[in-house]
Amino acid sequence: MRHYEIVFMVHPDQSEQVPGMIERYSATITNAAGTIHRLEDWGRRQLAYPISKLHKAHYVLLNVEAPQEAIDELETNFRFNDAVIRSMVMRVKHAVTEASPMVKAKDERRERHDFASEANDDSEAGDSEE
């Protein structure tokens, strides 16, 4: 089986349907004896350019190992699902399991924010003791 990287973008008004879509597409892959190496829900993000007068979309990334039939079925599902505004399936040489740069940057921002809020709490506690 080959390795694929799949990204699909969902209409921002349909964001509440994303978990169900992820589950359905994941089931399509696993039912065809495929494996999911990485699944990332990037959330709602700004588009580089408007698509159908939309400026934001909900992004989902999958790295999978699956047979061609499962990939064909996924592409058909993407094409006929009106909530999916764009999708891209790329074949890659190896399975990718580490976090993507998008998730790494998000985690770093969260860590900096947590560190800053802890430093704020410490300085406020120091002020009240004096």
Swiss-Prot record:
Keywords, alphabetical: Ribonucleoprotein, Ribosomal protein, RNA-binding, rRNA-binding
MF (Gene Ontology): small ribosomal subunit rRNA binding; structural constituent of ribosome
Keyword Transmembrane helix: no
GO terms under cellular component: cytosolic small ribosomal subunit
Domain of life according to the entry: Bacteria
Keyword Ribonucleoprotein listed: yes
Annotated region (Disordered), positions in chain: 100-130
A Pfam match: Ribosomal_S6
Biased composition (Basic and acidic residues): 104-116
Biased composition (Acidic residues): 119-130
Function: Binds together with bS18 to 16S ribosomal RNA.
Family named by the database record: Belongs to the bacterial ribosomal protein bS6 family.
Protein name per Swiss-Prot or TrEMBL: Small ribosomal subunit protein bS6
Source organism per UniProt: Yersinia pestis (strain Pestoides F)
Record lineage: Bacteria, Pseudomonadati, Pseudomonadota, Gammaproteobacteria, Enterobacterales
